[in-house]
Structure formats: C-alpha cells, structure tokens
Amino acid sequence: MKISTKGRYALRMMVDIAEHQKDGYVTLKDVALRQGISKKYLEQIALHISQAGMLRAVRGYQGGYMLARPASEYSVHSILQVVEGSMAPVTCLQQAEYKCERRDTCRTLPLWQGLEALITNYLSGITLEDVVEGRIPGPNLQ
C-alpha cells in the first residue's frame, strides 16, 4: 500500500484548516499558498471530503471551509480512507474489489492481514488534533 499524493495532500489540507479555522472559514486559496499545492487540486480533494461530511463549506464572501466536527474526532485513517479508498496493503484484502482464488489456502494471507491491522490501528489511533499539536506517537510494534 502506498499513500498517493492525493492522500498526503488531503491530510495536509485538513491539518491546515484545523490550524486556521479559529478565525473563521478557511479559503482553499490560502491553504494552497501555505501548503504549496494547486488550488484546483485542493478543490477536487475538498469536494470528496465535504461529501463525506468531514468539512462544512460556505460559498461567497467570507466563505471557505471549516471542519464539521472537532479535530479530535477525525482519525488520520478516516481522512485517508475517504480519498484513498481501501487501505489494504495487497490486492487480495480488497474483498469488494477482488476475490483471489487462493484466498482459502494462502499461507501468506495472515501476514498481510496482520500488516493491514497494524496500519489501520496505528492510523486510527492518531487524530487530526494530534497532528496539529505535534503529538504523533511512534508505532507500538510489540
């Protein structure tokens, strides 16, 4: 599994909005300038995230974006999942999209399931607020 540019930019956008929304709605123009990301690309990402109910959008003068809930209620995993879709490290774990004929006898399947669980648990345990506050824990590999 590789996090795409879209996923990385989505997380950066959400962090930026969380950091700056105390002064009101945050424009994508401002996010684009601060983050060095194309405004057009951010518009596509913001649309997906808004449709998922994670952002509130207001058009017009003094419009922009704001988190729909407190930053503490968004996990990094939930944000990435909106734009990335499946976070499975291998195709055979994307059940809805792919059925491997060897799934029932595959000796390596438990390895991939374990890796997926580590990734999911780690990213689910980090909130947007944690990222904003710089409280990103190292992975607990025990």
Regions from the language model: what does each represent?
Residues 10-22:
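Short amphipathic alpha-helical interface segments
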Residues 51-54, 82:
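Residue cluster at the C-terminal edge of the helix-turn-helix DNA-binding motif
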